[in-house]
């Protein structure tokens, strides 16, 4: 009796051949292309696009020509004018011409109010203008003899405004001298004012006709021998004297008896910034 022996390698070849035949039949029967073929096709199309792209960018196709008369001529003229404007741009306007145009159109207004742009200068000019409106003009001088200068200036004011018997006006005069001068000059002002009042009380006074007083020494306040100075030194030999030059006659004439009030009380009132018009001697 003969037995059939099963050989494994024979079965393997048979199965492999059958698998290959099945795969070939399945591949032939599959209607869609494989992914490998699709990828190859996509890459090739991209490569062709990359190759053709520079040609499309750097070599533009010429515009189509039209045989009509008016539209073609207008389009050609516009194209030529645009190209001419690009090739020849307008010249940039210079800075000097721009500034001249702004000045002519009054957009830039240049005002020079003084020698500098200092706020203190404007405040000083404003104060001087107010003092001129009140009938007085402030003059600052650097003097080597402040007592004599203060006394002569006070005598000038008394002589011009006829303040011989008007004690209220004399007190206002002393008030303004103390106000506009530094504290180091107050002792010279007090001494000059006391001597002025004593001379007015003892010496012959001015009559109604307007005859000058023989005891009053008048000196021109605008003498050029003193240099003009804004600030004064605290030295005893040199101080700044500030005078009032008369412009219009102020005050009222009277024949009240002169009496010297407390000068120290008046100085305290000056420190408290009291208006001299409200101050009346007791």
UniProtKB/Swiss-Prot annotation:
The gene is OFP18. Disulfide bonds: none annotated. It comes from the Eukaryota. It comes from Arabidopsis thaliana (Mouse-ear cress). GO terms for cellular component: nucleus. Keywords: Nucleus, Repressor, Transcription, Transcription regulation. One of its GO terms (biological process) is negative regulation of DNA-templated transcription. Residues 1-85 are annotated as: Disordered. Expressed in roots and shoots. Residues 139-199 form the OVATE domain. Transcriptional repressor that regulates multiple aspects of plant growth and development through the regulation of BEL1-LIKE (BLH) and KNOX TALE (KNAT) homeodomain transcription factors. This is Transcription repressor OFP18. Its main location: nucleus. The keyword Lipid biosynthesis does not apply. Residues 36-47 have a biased composition (Polar residues). The keyword NAD does not apply.
